[in-house]
Structure formats: C-alpha cells, structure tokens
Amino acid sequence: EMYQCPVIFMPDLQQGLNKQSVPSFDLNRVPINRGKMMKEADLPALEQPKYFKRFELTEDGISPRTIPGMKNGLFLSTGLEHNEEGKPAEAPTMHVAQTDKRFRKLETVADNYEPFLNNAKYDEADVLVVGMASSRGAIEEAVAEFDQEGVKVNHLQLRLIKPFPAKQLQPFFDAAKKVVIVEHNKT
C-alpha cells in the first residue's frame, strides 16, 4: 500500500512443507499505511479535460493517489509508458523521467525498510553467515556452538532481496575473513 507496488512472498521448502499449530494472528497489531492517499476535500477542482496527476514525478518516486470514483481524482491507467496524468506518452524525455521515478521508488523502499536481521556481535568476524527464510534457526544454533568454541561468527538474515541491500551488506562482508551463504536448495 505505502509503496504502491506488488509484494511477492517467497516461502521456502521448509515453510511450504511444515505443519504447525500457531495462535491466530492479531491483525489489529499491524497498522496498514495507505501512503499518499488523497482525500476528496484536498483535491483541486479539475477543469475538463484535465486529469489528476496519478503518476506525478516526485522526489521519492511515490505519487499521490486517489480511489477510483473520487471527485476530481480522475486519471488514466494503461500498460503503455505514460505522462503524469496516465495518458500514453512516447516522448523519450517522459520515458526517462518515469523510469527514473520508478528507480527512486526502489531507493525509497531500500531507505525505509530494514532489509535484514542483524545478529552481528563482532566488529571483525572469522565468519559471516548469511541466510534467509527458515535457515535462521539452524544458523543461530550453529553460531551459538561456534561461540562456545571461540570462533567469532556474525549472522545476517535477509528479509528483502529486491532491491538487494548490497550497500548495507558490504561493511559486514568486508569485516569478515570468510562469508558463508546458507540456502535451502541444490545450488
């Protein structure tokens, strides 16, 4: 909702095959951030044939939006490259502007979301272990065993892979003598 983009949930084999009873999730604990949702009262009157700038070029890449049917919130939406009002636009300058806007949105997501769980305890580690999904429990168990043996092991658990948090991960990679990627498949 907030970033106006689809979310793809990628469970792994363990999650897909696991059967476990868990308490019902309290949906009231998680507020839904609708993002830049316009209110009808805030929409300026549109003189026909004007449209609301649904795809306005913004600094953070996220445009204000309306709910279909809102007075003065009329916009077009196509699968073609478009201008700020949603009208098809083939001009190279608009294509570049809209593409740049989409990439700014990815940067906004990366800046506002914690892309990985940081279990790094050491400034410099013998080993950095990076995992995702259900590998977490096994990794935490292994890290605890290595701690008892005096091996300095840091652990990062990825939560977001697009946009991939390369800039945020690099300092951890640089501070480790060896990096181990734990995944739950053949590769």
Predicted feature locations:
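Flexible, low-complexity linker and terminal segments
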Residues: 1-187
